[in-house]
Each structure stands twice: as C-alpha cells, then as structure tokens.
Amino acid sequence: MPTKLWEKNVQVNDAIERFTVGHDRELDLYLAKYDVLGSMAHITMLESIGLLTADELRTLLAELRAIYADADAGRFVIEDGVEDVHSEVELLLTRRLGDVGKKIHSGRSRNDQVLLDLKLFTRDKIRDVAEHVMALIGELQAQSERHRNVLMPGYTHLQVAMPSSFGLWFGAYAESLADDLVLLEAAYRTTNRNPLGSAAGYGSSFPLDREMTTRLLGFDSMDYNVVYAQMGRGKNERTVAFALAGIAGTVAKMAFDACLFNSQNFGFVKLPDECTTGSSIMPHKKNPDVFELIRARCNRIQSLPEQITLIMNNLPVGYFRDLQEIKEVFLPAFDALTDCLVMATYIIHRMKVNEHILDDARYDAMFSVEEVNRLAAGGMPFRDAYKKVGLEIEAGTFVPDKHIHHTHAGSIGNLCNDRVKAMAEATFARFGFGRVTEAEQKLLQP
C-alpha cells in the first residue's frame, strides 16, 4: 500500500481517510495533465538553480511526457490507496526512476501545486467556453441577418407591446453573449497568473526562479505575494464562476424564450423535430426538452458563485481543507456549460421562424405607438395623438399601418450586427490563447 506524502509513523483511521478524501480522487482526474505540466516547469526551474542535474532533468522530463500522454488520452488512473493526483505522479516517477522521482517536490507544497493545477485547468477550460460562445454568437448573428426584416411582437410584462423583429431577437442574445465574454476575459486575467513558488503560502528558502516558471507556463504574470497566492484559492474560482454564471444566464433566458415561442399559443418559431421528444400518452406532442434542460442546467450554473462563497465564507488567511469542497462544484461546471452552448448552437442553426405572425389581427394594437409617432411628427401634440389612438383601439376602429421605418442605431432597420461582431472578435483576441498554447507545446517537446 503506497504511503501518503505526509505520512510519518502513525497510520490514519480508514473512516477518517474516506471522509477527508471524499471525491477528491475522482475530481483530481480533471487535473492530471495539468499537474504533470506544472511539474515539468517546476523541475526545469529546479535544474536551473542546481537542485537537479541535467541528466536527472532529462530523465524526469521524458517520463513526465509519457505520463502526460496517458493523462491526455484518458488512460491516467489514481491507484487504490493513493490520495490524490500529486501523489500518483510522484509514485509513478519513483517506481519507474527510483530516488530521482522523489526530488520533484523540492521547493513545492501541495498547496501551490493544486493552486497551479487549478489555474492551468481553468484557463484551458475558459478557452473552451470562449470558443463555444463565439460559435453561438456566430449562429445567432447569421439568423439575425437571415430574418432581419421579419417582424414579431415585442413584449413588456408578457403583454404585446411594440413591433420587434427576429433580427432584433437573435441579435440581442448575440450582443448579450458578447458582453458576457468581456467578463470572462476579466476572469481569465486573474486566472492567468502563476502561483507556483508560494509553497504552503509562505514561500521557500530555496532560491526559486518564479519568473522562469511564469515564462515556461505561458502566464501573463504571477501572484507576487506568496500569502496572497494562497488567499486566491477560492477567490479566483468565484471570479470565474461569476463569468460562467453570466453566460449561463443569457443562455437560460434564450432557452426560456425558445420554449415559449415554440408553443402553439405563440407559434413564432419551430424547433427541428429531431431536437424534440414525444409523450408516452399524447401522440401529438413535440416537447422542447433540450431547451428545458439547457435552462435548468444553466440556472444551476448561476448558483455556482453563491455555492463557492458559502464554502469559503469567513475563512482567515492561509489554506484550509474547506477549500477542497470547491472542486466538487467548480470543476464539472465547465463541461456542463459547454454542453449547453453546443446544444444551443446546434438548435439555433436549425430553428425555423414564422414569417406570417402579423397576419393575426390580435397583434394589430402593437402598431399603436407607430401611429402616435406619425401623428406627432405631423404636428399633433404627442399627448393628443396618444389619446386619439387609444380611443380608436377601445372603439375597435384602429387600422394599423404595418410598414415601419426605424433607422437609428440598434433598431429594427439598423441592427448593428457588424459592430457587435467586431466587439466580440476584439474581446476574443485579447485573451491571447495562442501564446499559452505556444508555451505549453514548447514545454512538452522532447
């Protein structure tokens, strides 16, 4: 049975071990390849300050690359009796290479090791989310342009209000996601800082070259103060969680609209048959289950910042085991959100719109504001025009003119989709994902 990295001459109670480890072994599989990547940078730095020989470094790097390949391919496992991913990697190195495998932990604590793993994992997953957000923005804008001239009712208080268009509806969600991307970029900025070298939260007596590991791992900068680096555990996850929650909020709202507009009482859009499910008793049913599940899962993601806040609430400075619990809600959230983004993009691309909604007379009254504005533009005082049209509606004599002419920025006739696209693309470019990829690939090269 492998010993714990911290074990001395007292064996821990089995029940205590099960309780304290919890689901950490399973969750650590999310972090496996990032743990290896961090170790590669760390030992490269250790060799530069004389704590490893060049031959030892070459041997360790070769074995770590093999472990990385297993982790990347999903073949990495944490053996029974091994506490976490850090212990498994060190065990494999020691088993295969002997005593040199025991040297990789010099100048490092599991505290800064897991901090590093989480940051490397998070920035990689942020990239996945950002790419899927951009794909959904693209589909929404394509539909907005395709149906830019198709009018639909706009609502306030769920009451028919004023003319809108599918160009506006699709485009509104594209712009909302473009704004959400700005928050995700801010979260990425705090994520892409190197905590390695903070050790247990108070640094090391070894002359660690933190600038070197920052450069090797493609970080923008480092968490400079070693105490703050440890204070960032939980804080950074919460910052990222707020960004994920913003995206989830937009997608959940869109899913609600789609379910509503797809219902027979609205009939504004039609979802593809292959994206709906049936009923075991009602043969006519085509249920929007995908959008309903997207809504539910995105609503759950919106609770993530509060869950993290409550776990870390009122903790003083330093590391506490409470923080382990954050991994259980935080790590799976990225895949949950990207799954929702993929499904939403797929269905939006195939969604059909009803181009004849306004043939129904029940929507005639929404053109009342257009008539009031026309009368006011002709010289009638606005309040008099408002009263005149209101009386016509009450008397049932109002005859709408359904030809509208909106030209100002962001209106039915001037969607500004090109500006929103440029804004989203500029935000995406600022992430600088390419520089991170280049650094990681260089580190992995033999």
Map each language-model feature to its residues.
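Alpha-helix capping and helix-loop boundary segments enriched in small/acidic/polar residues
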Residues: 105, 110-113, 157-164, 168, ...
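Acidic, glycine-rich loop-and-beta core segments that form the ion-binding/anion-interacting portion
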Residues: 217-305
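A general structural motif at alpha-helix termini
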Residues: 60-61, 217, 273-275, 362, ...
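Short amphipathic alpha-helical segments with heptad-repeat character
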Residues: 119, 123-130, 134, 141, ...
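Charged/polar positions within long, soluble alpha-helices
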Residues: 44, 48, 69-76, 94, ...
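Glycine-rich cofactor/substrate-binding loops
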Residues: 2-38, 99-100, 267, 282-446
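A helix-coil-helix interface module used to build multimeric assemblies
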Residues: 1-203, 208-214, 221, 277-278, ...
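A short structural micro-motif
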Residues: 62-70, 231-234, 391-396
